[in-house]
Amino acid sequence: KEGYPIGSFYGYKAVGIMSELDYKNALKDREVYLANGSKFPAGYTLQGPAVPSYALDDLSYGNTIWKDVSGDGVIDTNDKTILGNAYPDFTGGFSTSLSWKGFDLGASFTYSYGGEVINFQDYYLFNVEGSSNQYAIAADRYVSDTNPGRNNVPIATRISVTNQSLKLSSYYVEDASYFRCSNITLGYTLPK
């Protein structure tokens, strides 16, 4: 996006999973939206979460709720935002060594702080569009308010407007910070 650093991830921010009550309220919002010429009247307060399209019938509970960045009550390209950046804030490394009675121990460490990564493995293994396997956790997706699953995995759907699997979103962006021992050596010097 123009005006932002190179390496930024740009997409939708996931803020939750749509419950049955959210769904019913979004349907009420859709009636108002359609009755007013595909827009909301000035000053209208949403009953439910903003959704991708009030004109389509593909809305369902269990879908991802997206952040309405533009505040217009409809999720569209104006609601994409910067989700993170691939470049870390800083990186570094250090090494150390110890010796004692013929034994020596050396270790090297590297670290990176800040920066994000897109987990494309999750992108494919939560996706119902592909021909690959899925995570076992995906079987415990949201089904209903009485069976919400045990995780934050949205309902499985092949509908492109609501399918969170097809959108680059905060759902797949993870912190890339790390602290790692990159090398460790233990030695012993034989006496002469």
Region annotations inferred by a language model:
Residues 4-8, 58-61, 114-192:
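Extracytoplasmic gating/loop element in the C-terminal half of outer-membrane beta-barrel translocons
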Residues 1-84:
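Conserved small-residue
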Residues 78, 86-90, 98:
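Active-site beta-strand/loop architecture of penicillin-binding DD-peptidases
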Residues 102-106:
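Repeated loop/turn-to-beta-strand initiation elements of outer-membrane beta-barrel proteins
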Residues 74, 88, 177-178:
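Secondary-structure capping and boundary motifs in well-ordered enzyme cores
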Residues 13, 95-97, 185-189:
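Outer-membrane beta-barrel architecture
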Residues 81-85, 172-175:
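Outer-membrane beta-barrel domain signature
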Residues 99, 110-112:
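Outer-membrane beta-barrel pore domains and translocons
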